[in-house]
């Protein structure tokens, strides 16, 4: 409800052959995660272009991925396992809430962070990602990592209007 334009932009971005990764930006609580869930619902209902009809949306919890990785190599091993799982199932769209956290995640002074580990798969198109972050974190963190940021299309998410908010409440 009230997010048709943003959902349309998201579907068009994910369905593209090049630069098909998307980062949803907006204030806290504006519904970025709900939009990713809306995409999953559209896919289940078959209301998307054929190129993404067979896709499944997975959510990656970066906090759980990093938790307990106290030794060098633990995080890299988890990322490697994630990459292998995603390669075995190519019809996955990965949703990463708070995507700015992948920059620096798991890195020590001589290891790669999650962002650098994802770049090759993003560049080749083997991995489709939808991220969500606040405008502030996008500017402060994500935008400064230009090699990663250029692989994403930014889609702004505004607060819903009062009318749309009331409609959402009526449907719940």
Residue ranges and their predicted role:
Residues 1-172:
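AAA+ P-loop NTPase nucleotide-binding core of proteostasis motors
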């Amino acid at each position: 409800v009230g997010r048709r334009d943003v959902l349309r932009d998201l579907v068009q971005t994910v369905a593209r052959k090049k630069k098909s990764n998307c980062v949803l930006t907006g204030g806290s609580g504006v519904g970025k995660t709900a939009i990713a869930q809306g995409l999953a619902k559209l896919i289940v209902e078959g209301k998307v272009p054929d190129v993404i009809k067979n896709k499944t949306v997975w959510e990656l919890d970066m906090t759980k991925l990093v938790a307990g990785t106290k030794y060098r190599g633990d995080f890299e091993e988890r990322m490697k396992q994630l990459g292998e799982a995603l390669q075995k199932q190519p019809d996955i769209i990965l949703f990463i809430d708070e995507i700015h956290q992948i920059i620096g995640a798991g890195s020590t002074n001589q290891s790669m962070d999650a962002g650098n580990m994802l770049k090759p798969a993003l560049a080749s198109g083997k991995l489709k990602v939808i991220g969500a972050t606040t405008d502030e974190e996008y500017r402060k963190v994500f935008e400064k990592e230009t090699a990663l940021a250029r692989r994403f299309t930014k889609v702004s998410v505004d607060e819903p209007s009062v009318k749309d908010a009331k409609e959402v409440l009526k449907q719940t």
